[in-house]
Design a protein with these regions (language model features):
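Transmembrane beta-barrel wall of Gram-negative outer-membrane proteins
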Residues: 44-178, 201-208
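Short linear interaction motifs
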Residues: 68-73, 187-192, 253-256, 268-272
Length: 342
């Protein structure tokens, strides 16, 4: 068993951006806070675009109110904790009536934080001159949780060996980010974008293989079968935008909000068999006859949905100046104020 603790001078113990998320985020798994709400999930699965043409105002209101508010939208500042991790490993071998049985297992957990500040610019050529289009100050705080497991099982004797290996890797990234600066493409006004994100990348692979010898080793048969699945899940990938009023205070640009749900799954199945027969021709020569067959099948599915709250009527100054979770509270999600659309 191994355990580790660490930190760095820029992140650990200093106040940086965070958002709450769910109570179990530190494990790399959330507590279903980020599950797609029922009515929205049904619309996604049925291929119905979420808009006023396909759903009533009451249904759109229910969908909008079903989206998680403050825990996934409100940026705050807290002291960043230390990094930590541990690793467990073990194994054994044991002689049985069928042969030698071996087992090995390794599991690990790592939790790290990385805070960054910098500048992000986009430019374009005007003639021979490169001029900035946007120039943003960027502040980010990223929490990465990595989980891994490796397990192996084998059984072998003089003529036969079978091995089964499983690998699971999960990498979860939780990031709170804010960018602010002039957007010269939109008149040079100050724009601020706040982001809350949660990305889950997973890999699972299982492989079983065998090697067998018959006829005093003259006939050898090797076989293998494998399954691998990779996935990327990004629920509630959110952006909320602000402009600046005459007094220099940030106010909501409600048309700049975006809440995205995306998934990607990649499945691979493969297998094969090889056989070889050795025919002695003399003490110095032999002939080897071999044959083999293999197959591979791959399937990929990807899906993405972008949701946005649109202002049905002009927002009041009080609404535009309110906190993010107040503006998108149930009180303001109704047929006359904010309405959800895809």
């Amino acid at each position: 068993m191994k355990a580790s603790i660490g930190g760095n001078t820029e992140s650990t113990g200093k106040e940086h951006l965070i958002y709450f998320g769910s109570r179990t985020d530190f494990t790399g798994f959330d507590d279903d806070t980020r599950e797609v709400p029922g009515l929205i999930d049904i619309a996604f699965k049925n291929g119905q675009q979420i808009n006023s043409a396909n759903f009533s105002a009451t249904e759109l209101q229910q969908m909008g109110r079903a989206l998680v508010n403050a825990p996934l939208r409100l940026l705050q500042r807290e002291k960043t904790p230390v990094d930590g991790g541990f690793e467990l490993s073990g194994g054994f071998s044991h002689d049985t009536g069928l042969g030698s049985l071996g087992v090995i297992a390794v599991a690990g957990y790592d939790n790290s934080w990385r805070a960054r500040e910098g500048f992000q610019e986009e430019g374009q050529f005007q003639g021979d001159e490169l001029v900035p289009v946007t120039s943003y100050a960027v502040e980010s705080n990223q929490n990465d949780v990595r989980l891994n497991f490796l397990g192996g099982l084998s059984l072998s004797n003089d003529d036969h060996e079978v091995k089964w290996t499983n690998l699971y890797v999960r990498n979860t990234t939780k990031e709170a980010r804010s960018t602010a600066g002039p957007d010269f493409d939109a008149g040079g006004g100050i724009i601020r974008n706040d982001y809350t994100e949660w990305f889950v990348r997973q890999l699972f692979t299982s492989q079983i293989a065998g090697e067998h010898h018959f006829m005093d080793g003259a006939l050898e048969i090797d076989w293998r079968a494998a399954y691998a699945k990779t996935s990327r899940d990004a629920p509630y990938e959110s952006r909320f935008q602000y402009g600046v009023d005459a007094d220099g205070n940030y106010i909501h640009n409600v048309q700049g909000n975006l809440i995205s749900f995306s998934e990607l799954d990649d499945d691979n199945v493969s297998g094969g068999v090889d056989a070889a027969y050795t025919l002695p021709l003399s003490n110095a020569r032999e002939a080897i006859f071999s044959v083999g067959v293999s197959s591979f099948d791959s399937n990929r599915d990807a899906e993405r949905h972008d949701l946005q709250f649109e202002a049905v009527n002009a927002l009041t100054e009080e609404q535009r100046q309110s906190r993010i979770d107040y503006l998108f509270s149930d009180y303001n999600i109704n047929p006359s104020t904010l309405q959800l659309r895809e």
